[in-house]
Curated annotation (Swiss-Prot):
Its main location: cytoplasm. The lineage of its organism: Bacteria, Bacillati, Cyanobacteriota, Cyanophyceae, Nostocales. This is Exodeoxyribonuclease 7 large subunit. InterPro entries: Exonuc_VII_L, Exonuc_VII_lsu_C, OB-fold_nuc-bd_dom. Keywords: Cytoplasm, Exonuclease, Hydrolase, Nuclease. PANTHER family: EXODEOXYRIBONUCLEASE 7 LARGE SUBUNIT. It catalyses: Exonucleolytic cleavage in either 5'- to 3'- or 3'- to 5'-direction to yield nucleoside 5'-phosphates. Coiled coil: none annotated. It comes from the Bacteria. NCBIfam families: xseA (TIGR00237). Pfam families: Exonuc_VII_L, tRNA_anti_2.
Length: 412
């Protein structure tokens, strides 16, 4: 009797295989932590199938393993394909299959274990911006050949700013440079850079913009992978040249910029030509033109002598006279052409020489002008910038004078 009662109780409380499986599936698939879980491990095996990519992820010591699947529609979205022997971090959810009594991880994303989430976010943003066409070569704009005003966005305390100033002054004296300071490292950097670019656009004078900073660790350059900064560069109304760091990975700002170089100095060299190099190129062209003219003249003289010899052999006075007149006309025409081109070349060279002289700040000072600087070294361009009592440094053609403002008159 007792045995029958015990058997009846067990039978009433016993679960079927499907009942137990359904219960376990509810526990696994409805657990919030298991619906989106990151798992790190080593890929021990892979199997490519028409329906998807199947692989096993295990601990390095082999003490535990889990089967994983990436369905075919999701495979192209993976940042890293599973390869046997490699360490991966995968993102997925737990699924239980009643027929086999097995559970496995349905994977949505996989990244190398040594790179982590930051690389994943970088790749996802890069793919999204690429799909929008922000990196298309057709979007790249040409830089102005001879800009009169450029803007620079960087930190006022960075060595990059000094390198850019030195390069611009050496290559293109007289250039007007607008400086829009920004923080280029840390959490506040993206917003600061976006505001600095906006200031340049609002000012409206710059023809090209340099966005730059010196070298640094990858984490220090994170602001140049920020979506806000990337879109600000992409939407900028003037061409943008980036010069970020010396040895670094490619940043998203580099990809979207119109021109990308590796250093602040190289960025400055990109936006302006070297007047000295231009002058030398023009001299070389004049020399080449002179050589061409000499060659043409020599060739014509040789041809003329050949014709003379032929005419002498023909002994036809009338024909000789006609040919002599024709050759004389050709000679006069050649001389006129040679003199004309030579004069044009001289005028062009003189124009370049005068332009170089006019761009030389010392030449301007020799004509009686002066450069007035405030105590902080900034050039005073308007009486509005000055106040009574300010000390000024006046640079003349010969020497420098220190003065103090005793009265300020506003121009009506």
């Amino acid at each position: 009797m007792a045995a029958d009662f015990a058997a009846s109780v067990i039978l009433d409380t016993a679960l079927s295989v499907s009942g137990l499986t359904d219960y376990l599936r509810l526990l696994l698939e409805h657990d919030e932590q298991l619906r989106q879980v990151w798992v790190v491990g080593e890929v021990s095996s892979t199997n490519h199938h028409r329906s998807g990519l199947f692989f096993t992820l295990q601990d390095p010591d082999g003490s535990a393993a889990i089967k994983c699947v990436v369905w075919s529609s999701q495979v192209p979205k993976l940042a890293q394909l599973p390869v046997a022997g490699e360490q991966l971090i995968v993102l997925g959810s737990i699924r239980l299959y009643p027929q086999r009594g097995e559970y496995q991880l349905s994977v949505w994303q996989a990244v190398p274990a040594g790179v982590g989430l930051q690389a994943l976010r970088y790749q996802q943003l890069k793919n999204r911006l690429l799909a929008e066409g922000l990196f298309d070569p057709q979007r790249k704009r040409s830089l102005p050949i001879h800009p009169q005003t450029i803007a620079v966005v960087t930190s006022p305390t960075a060595a990059a700013w000094g390198d850019i100033q030195k390069t611009l002054k050496h290559r293109y004296p007289g250039l007007h440079v607008l400086f829009s300071p920004a923080t280029v490292q840390g959490e506040q950097a993206p917003e600061s850079i976006v505001k600095a670019i906006a200031r340049v656009e609002k000012d409206g004078r710059a023809e090209v913009l340099i966005l730059s900073r010196g070298g640094g660790a990858v984490e220090e350059l994170a602001c140049f992978n920020d979506e806000r900064v990337v879109r600000a560069v992409a939407e900028c109304s003037i061409p943008v040249v980036t010069g970020i760091g010396h040895q670094r990975d490619e940043s998203l700002v580099d990809l979207v910029a119109d021109v990308c170089v590796h250093t602040p100095t190289a960025a400055a060299e990109k936006v302006v030509p070297s007047l000295a190099e231009l002058s030398n190129q023009h001299r070389q062209r004049i020399i080449a033109l002179h050589q061409v003219l000499l060659h043409t003249q020599t060739s014509a003289e040789n041809q003329l002598q050949t014709l003379r010899n032929r005419l002498q052999n023909l002994r036809l006075d009338r024909h000789l006279q006609q040919e002599a007149q024709k050759l004389n006309w050709q000679r006069q025409r050649l001389l006129q052409l040679t003199m004309g081109r030579s004069q044009q070349a001289k005028q062009h060279l003189e124009l370049l020489r005068q332009k170089l002289i006019s761009l030389d700040p010392k030449s301007v000072l020799q004509r009686g002008y002066a450069v007035v600087r405030q105590e902080n070294g900034a050039i005073a361009r308007s009486a509005d910038e000055l106040a009574v009592g300010n000390e000024l440094f006046i640079q003349l053609a010969q020497g420098e004078v220190k003065a103090k403002v005793i009265e300020v008159e506003q121009r009506q």
